[in-house]
Amino acid sequence: MKLYTFEVHGERRYGAELKSQLVDLPIAYTALLTARGSQPGALPALPLTLLQFIAAGEPALTAARAALAFMAKRPALPVGERATYLVEEVKLLAPIPRPGKILCSGLNYRSHAKENPNAKFLEDPRFFAKVPSVVIGHGESIRHPGLRYQVDYGVELAVVIGQAMHHATQQNALSHVFGYTILHDVSARWIEFKDNNETMGKNFDTFCPIGPCIVTADEIADPGRLRLTLKLNGQMMQDRTNEDWIFPLPRMLEWLSSAMTLEPGDLMSTGTPCGTGYFRKPQVFLKPGDVCRLEIEGIGMLENPVVAAGN
């Protein structure tokens, strides 16, 4: 199931993809209950936000699947009710506009570590944080602070936590995963590497595009065998599979949850492959007017234009 958060008629909604349309899940599920009547054990309603939906777990997913099957039959809805939209009719937002935590793995691709002359291969995964307020969605603009900041790009697979986890093991870690999305790790390298100020360099406003959707874990057979690409103005800059990971996904989740509780809706990003602009010769940095297009197989495409910060 591909799940989206979107805005329509000035209201924030969420839904799932069905035959190239978006189904408003809370409305569709209410219509299903009205048509069939309540059933033993059924949810009385779906939550109002995608974050609440994720936290509701399997009962919410079961209800959503039933709602999609109902809408596939093109039922007549009450006058004034609408549950389906074309993608062009809505504004896509970040699937989780304000995640509780955004934790990103650094130097987790062998190819990326090798292109960095100062990198050291570590015994344990390395993480940094992005703050929730820098998140934007598909189609929104990355605001460029100025050329001296050396703004760089990086495509990453992000894990969406479904069940709270603390001290997970590699054997059970994936059972806590709700799904996967695309994260664009935008960085101001001049700030990041000047005085080793990674937190500020990673957290300029708009420096964390996420989307376009969350794909539920059951649709990704092996998250460790996906192809990731990033194109800058149509030119391929990154193209790798995550078989290049240094630390596999269960190991990253085990390590991170040994220190903190990961909660429903938290994001853990798994690193970027080689091809980032800072380590190219000559270097390539983002500038106003650029367009970044990120794709991960099985998930979709995340595209964002770059504009000057004052625009």
Region spans (language model):
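N-terminal non-catalytic cap/leader segment that marks the start of a structured domain
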Residues: M1-F121
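A generic local secondary-structure boundary/capping motif
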Residues: Y4, K91-A94, E115-N118, I142-V151, ...
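Short, structured patches in soluble enzyme cores that scaffold and shape functional sites
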Residues: E7, L107, K130-P132, G139, ...
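Catalytic-pocket segment enriched in acidic/His residues
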Residues: H9, A76, H112, S187-N311
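Structural signature of FAD isoalloxazine-binding scaffolds in flavoprotein oxidoreductases
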Residues: A16, K120-G137, Y153, K287-G298
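Residue "hotspots" at secondary-structure boundaries inside conserved domains
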Residues: A94, K101, Y149-V151, E254, ...
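Residue-level recognition of short, solvent-exposed, well-ordered loop/turn junctions
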Residues: P97, C104, G137, D152-G154, ...
